[in-house]
Amino acid sequence: MRRILALQILFLVVAFVAAAQPVAPTNVVAFSGDQSAIVHWDLDPGPNLAGYNVYRSLSSGGPFTQLNTGLLTTLGYCDLNVSDGQTYYYQVTAVNATSQTSPPSATVSTLPNPFPSDDAFLDYLQEANFDYFWYAGNPANGLIPDRSTTGSACSIASVGFGLTAIGIAIDHGWITRDQGAARVLTTLNTFWNGPQGTNASGDIGYNGWFYHFLDMNLATRSGSSELSSIDTTLLLGGILYAKQYFNGTNATETSIQTTASAIFNRVNWSWMAPDVPGTNGVRMGWLPDSGFSTFGDWIGYDEGMLIYLLGIGATSNSLPAASWSYWTSGYVWASYYGYSFVTFPPLFGHEYSHCWVDFRHVGDTYMNNENCTYFENSHRAALAQQAYCIADPDGWAGYNSLIWGLTASDDPSGYSAHGAPPAENDNGTIAFTAAGGAMAFAPEISLPSLKNFYTNGKKKFWTQYGFIDAFNLSAAWYDNAELGIDQGPIVIMIENYRNQNVCRLFMQNPEIQNGLQLAGFVPLPFMPLTAQAQPAQSTLTLAWAATSNRTYQVEYSTNLISWFTSPTGEVTATNAVASWTDTGPPGTLTVPFSDTARFYRVFQYGTP
């Protein structure tokens, strides 16, 4: 009798728990741009959650109308049916598996308006893209999904971009420093404490390296993914940035610093370079069952550059300095569409390392011999790709000066590394991260494209996480997902364009400074200048002592913090004095003398 009574009580408890009404979503926020509004909220940890509904009203007191037609499984909603100048009010409810609905959340409001400036547009673009890392991530362990679709595994490279985006978000006021620090420490603890070993499953990595994809909840190897040298390195980029950003003395921030150092110092770089002596090539990956046998080396120009710089600069189990020469031995310098540069067709290879490393005023032996820098090399690659899209030799729909951007992305057939010549792999697919990731070195073509994509395409392109991954007008195809490795460079490279804060902090790490020095990078000299202004003609001429046939680059700033490369400021001297005249666009991005102050500097390309 007691057993029967106990079972009855148990059944009643189970039934009561299953029938419990969900709690109202918390920390609901809303923000808006030109003719769009975005709403986000925190994850409901309650049992049997099925999804969410979003409601809108023109009045704080209602009535509220449901916007979504099916339950939302993400923590955000993008409202594209709004008008500028009208305040909109939003509420969110949670729904459980038995279709019970929570009380409505607190009401939030936002007022869409046209962007008053380019900075306002960039703020909106960055915040929306940052939200992918904050709301799509798992707050319990800090992991970030590879893509926004349901069931995605974690991409450890996405985590690296996300750690960097958190610092940017704090600087812009989208989250607090305490919120960001707590999420970062949670993330670092996941990677530090996760089991390392040679098991086929159940480990997060081995020899300090990490698996490319991880289970979002277990933080262990997902499927048959490889131990990835490049994805681990992109993760380390974010970890080393976080180490410098969170430089406080409280317990959380000091733990971030020590854990970040521990994760980096545990990486066995030399183990990932098992080739015969003299080659020093880093392998692309390793598998528990077959080792390195199915993977080639990183050689030649692409996103792998950061692997060698950090590996050479490491203080334990480091790569030999000679490995940099092995890496550069695979470079191909060529000319396409009027620009000469080290080639790599998809633009991501010209962008990823630049998210963290400031290559503007340093050069290695290879680049110094070409009178170039890696920063300028990426600039030329972006310009050449835009020129290719303008020419559109294959006749893809839509290509022009504003619709360009070929890189690794989703496409109508799956996922592919798209690019322009020399190894052209173009099927008409444009990815927003290509232009967004080029902002730091090609703002003169990237910013107009991003604004065009939003202004003329937001009904198909814009979501609660910023731009979708890609589109293909020839196939009438528009992606249904966002990717962490593509949203991240948009946030980061816009920030590097605006203030260079990410690079400035990352470059404070002794590991990268040591790596650059051992790889043979040297600082490029700045030239003493004289200036003569002609305000009536809105021009200004700079002059400096020069060496004939040497090449120089003009940069300018309005605040001595954010420096921009003049698109017309590359000057090759013909005698002992070189000069350059600022006449406004396209020499600079704003008309001269419209600023309160303007500052110039000139540096010399090539071996000092």
Regions found by a protein language model. Give the residues of each.
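Solvent-exposed loop/turn segments flanking beta-strands in beta-repeat/beta-sandwich domains
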Residues: 42-63, 547-555
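Ser/Thr/Asn(+Pro)-rich, low-complexity disordered segments
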Residues: 110-525
